[in-house]
């Protein structure tokens, strides 16, 4: 059995100053942020930029020094932080990958931005790449 990946949802880019980098991306590419959201429980603020026929670009900055993205920025500087795949069912994907020996950053999926359910695969499981799995909130 394998998990059902629907698409690459977004590419997360870690930035130190969200407002500054968002203005730069908007100027360079002529797009506006579709969404800007604070996630204080995760210690991050993010802005999502939509491009035609492409994954979203998610700019992510820390709200505090304890946020995982703050540690990433201190160790590696700004740049690509993660790739996100949409999955059909986050719970079954999580359980299936655990059976295959995949290590996760969290103990279980949790609520992400916009009411989605997410979980991160630890970089040591996939050659140093942080992968987010995301199940979108059901559309009403």
Where are these regions (language model features)?
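Vicinal oxygen chelate
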Residues: 3-4, 37, 47-50, 57, ...
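N-terminal beta-strand motif that seeds the catalytic metal site of vicinal oxygen chelate
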Residues: 1-20, 78-87, 137-140
